[in-house]
Design a protein with these regions (language model features):
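Polybasic, lysine-rich low-complexity intrinsically disordered segments
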Residues: 3-4
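Eukaryotic low-complexity, non-globular regulatory regions
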Residues: 7-26, 30, 36
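Non-catalytic, usually N-terminal nucleic-acid engagement modules in DNA/RNA processing proteins
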Residues: 27-102, 122
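Eukaryote-skewed repeat-based solenoidal scaffolds used as protein-protein interaction platforms
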Residues: 74, 82, 94-173
């Protein structure tokens, strides 16, 4: 009715301000979008945590650069490994909109998986979700030709049973 048209108009204006198509909200395309489903990678464990495949990456003379310091046209740090040991908000965009960041990340020797927080004060559900995000981004980057080194973390012993999921045995971590 009239109220739903009003609401739809507000939503359409909001999304036009952030460059999201409002027709995407009601379309079948959104429901089937891989960035919505996040199901394109093989999963492991009870929660189907995406698998970051083992890769051989030379660990000699590693240099690191924070994700917040990478450049579009890197010249001096191409042999560096990108890390995410930063506040989560500085790399949240990689989860929400990963594709536009690919070319920037491809310039570097390798990329660590993003270390989304697993604070002990967080509900276990959020810790599992952040572990899923860590591995999904790693699998996504690998599927786009980027060398990835998985990172792992845990809060308390209750997180041990899922924090290793999605990392192939024998991987450098």
């Amino acid at each position: 009715g009239e109220k739903s048209l009003f609401f739809y108009g507000i939503v359409e204006r909001l999304f036009s301000q952030v460059n999201i198509r409002s027709d995407f909200l009601t379309s079948e395309a959104f429901r089937n979008d891989p960035l919505f489903l996040r199901n394109q990678f093989e999963g492991e464990g009870t929660f189907q945590i995406p698998i970051v495949k083992k890769q051989h990456i030379s660990l000699e003379q590693l240099k690191f650069i924070g994700y917040d310091h990478i450049k579009s046209d890197e010249r001096e740090n191409k042999d560096s490994v990108v890390h995410f040991f930063l506040d989560d908000y500085k790399f949240e965009v990689l989860w929400n909109h990963p594709e536009p960041r690919l070319e920037k990340l491809k310039q570097y020797k390798a990329v660590l998986t993003p270390q989304y927080s697993l604070y002990t004060e967080m509900p276990i559900t959020l810790q599992i979700y952040n572990t899923f995000r860590n591995r999904w981004v790693g699998a996504y980057l690998q599927s786009n030709g980027i060398a990835v080194i998985p990172t792992m973390c845990w809060g308390e012993p209750q997180s041990f049973w899922f924090c290793f999921d999605g990392v192939e045995v024998g991987s450098f971590v």
